[in-house]
Amino acid sequence: MPEPAKSAPAPKKGSKKAVTKAQKKDGKKRKRSRKESYSIYVYKVLKQVHPDTGISSKAMGIMNSFVNDIFERIAGEASRLAHYNKRSTITSREIQTAVRLLLPGELAKHAVSEGTKAVTKYTSSK
């Protein structure tokens, strides 16, 4: 029985490498689109809290989604507060109030104190 003709070998199952830069007809390389995420910041905080602990790419994706979700909720609430008070600028006060409204009890208190500390550090460094 003759064997079927084999085409180019299929990439290995674990291989996730893809062609990043494709050649165009005129010889120029196409620029790879940048994907923004909070992963480097999540990693820095993880190393501050647990220096000997790592994080999987799946867990990093979940953390990135979480940070994006919280950011959108706080920004939306702060925008609503500014609109209610007929203001066109979102200040740290709107952000603080939005955090108090969105986060429960003790978590809101800690978030507000850390935020205040960060704003103070930023203004003193200017």
Curated annotation (Swiss-Prot):
Where ADP-ribosylserine occurs, residue numbers? 7
- Positions modified as N6-methylated lysine? 117
Q: Where in the cell is it found?
A: Nucleus; Chromosome
- Where are the residues linked by the Glycyl lysine isopeptide (Lys-Gly) (interchain with G-Cter in ubiquitin) cross-link? 35, 121
User: Which residues, renumbered to this chain, carry the PTM ADP-ribosyl glutamic acid?
Assistant: 3
Residue numbers of N6-lactoyllysine PTMs: 6, 12, 16-17, 21, 24, 44, 86, 109, 117, 121
Q: Which family does it belong to?
A: Belongs to the histone H2B family.
**Subunit annotation:** The nucleosome is a histone octamer containing two molecules each of H2A, H2B, H3 and H4 assembled in one H3-H4 heterotetramer and two H2A-H2B heterodimers. The octamer wraps approximately 147 bp of DNA.
Question: What's the protein name?
Answer: Histone H2B type 2-E
